[in-house]
Amino acid sequence: MGNSQPRNASRSRRTSQWPQGAAELGASASDHHYHQEELYQEQQQQQQQPQQEQPSSRRIQFQAHTNQPTQSHPPGDEEQPVQSQQQQLSTWSLGSLSGGRLNWSFSGARNSFRHRNKATRKSLTSLHGSRRGKTQWHRPLTNSIFNSHFKETSKNDLYRIDHLVAKGAFGVVFKVSSKSDISQCYALKVLKKSKLIEDNSVRQIKDEADIQKVCGHHPFIVKQIDLWQNRHNLHILSEYVPNGELFSKITHFSIDLVRLYIGEIALALDFLHNAGIIYRDAKPENILLTEQFHIKLTDFGLSKWLKLGANTRTMCGTFKYMAPEILCGEPYGHAVDWWALGVIACQMLTQKSPNIKRHLLRRRESVEPEDGLSNAPSIAQINGCLQDSDGDSEDFLPEEVQHLTHEGRDVLRKLLTIEPRQRIRSVMALQRIAIYKDYNLSSKQLLSLSPREIIARDGIRIYEDRHFDQLTNQCAIDAFLDF
């Protein structure tokens, strides 16, 4: 055809299978045989006709597969109108011109009549495991859901897993090291995408990534380094904080160490609040100790964007550290983080937690959709209960509080106030209480102090790191290895 050299009959005759959509076109097995013979006869006639050379281009004619045989225009006749040609060509798809030979196929056909050279045939048969026409599926939906924050890639060749650090509801945290420099260590949080989607936590994990990215430059907040995803998991790579969780290393605190740690946690919380973020998960497990024993906040899975002065109603957090207004199902704001800080301070000073009449502060089990009422008590009811109980309004504090210094009792009273509006809610307010008299509550000032020196001076015991057993560690690695 065109300018291509004539072939002999044995090479030019090809076997063509009828397209997959033949039923829709009204074709049958007999039609199929008829068209094979018709195509062969037309090809022989065209080879016998004199060829007309064109100096600048080749003339390519297509004939559509229809029930009525179509004839080529002899040289010199007028061509069909463009619209008619388009109707014929609409059934066919043009592949590519390779080595002066045309590759073309019937749209939707499983196998079709094709002119190909050897190289083209090899490349096409190797595509999709040598199955021509196999559908290229789009990326998994779970990838698209997280694509705005987590790029699709693999980091297996960059990091190696050292050991398991922590386990959670959605995944695990590993200590990993760089393969190019084993002295560079990181914390790798691996989360199951299926669990996040099942728990409707997609927006939550995206907020966590955004918040840690925005606030990670603060000296008392863990820095985020990288985010990525693969088919099954999300990965958050952060700086590694070597001395682990606060209470896993230290169980008894002097008043000077409490003053330092409460100040550092307060500065981190105040920074988050001023950035329009509520933390909602302040607890010892999320307070890590650096190599110099300064603190860093981690795990922003329950954090939320919330402007100062605004309220939210989501019931979340760890029960022991949840403020009364959360447990009562009332709207709450950033003051809940300061309550949690008070609970941590109470634990450091007395080794016990406050007891807020938990039989009254039970979780909401049901909320009526009509009026939003809850069976939990109100703040006013709690205050009334405390005032009617034996003793003073500090009845929920441990008895050991009575043996503390004035500074220790004062900081607990101001942080653990039932009424949120009367609670300490800023570093500025914290600076005015007795424990921070003549003390500069700033990041620069606190970083200039040495917790190690305070620990050594006050004879505070530091416990060794505790790791997961080998079986648990290996099971976690096997479950989350594909990073």
UniProtKB/Swiss-Prot annotation:
GO cellular component terms attached to this protein's record: cytoplasm; cytosol; nucleoplasm
Single GO molecular function: protein serine/threonine kinase activity
Location relative to the cell: Cytoplasm
Catalytic activity, EC: 2.7.11.-
Keywords (A to Z) from UniProt: ATP-binding, Cytoplasm, Kinase, Nucleotide-binding, Serine/threonine-protein kinase, Transferase
Pfam family, one: Pkinase
Tree of life domain: Eukaryota
Binding residues for ATP: 165-173, 189
Positions of the Protein kinase domain: 159-435
Disrupted-gene phenotype: Mutants are viable and fertile but display NMJ overgrowth with excess satellite boutons, fewer and larger synaptic vesicles, defective synaptic endocytosis and increased levels of tkv.
Primary location recorded for the protein, binned into one broad class: cytoplasm
Oligomeric form and interacting partners: Interacts with tkv.
Function as written in the Swiss-Prot or TrEMBL entry: Displays kinase activity. Inhibits neuromuscular junction (NMJ) growth by interacting with and promoting the proteasome-mediated degradation of the receptor tkv which inhibits bone morphogenetic protein (BMP) signaling.
Family per similarity comment: Belongs to the protein kinase superfamily. Ser/Thr protein kinase family.
Name used for this protein in its record: Serine/threonine-protein kinase S6KL
Native species: Drosophila melanogaster (Fruit fly)
Source species taxonomy: Eukaryota, Metazoa, Ecdysozoa, Arthropoda, Hexapoda
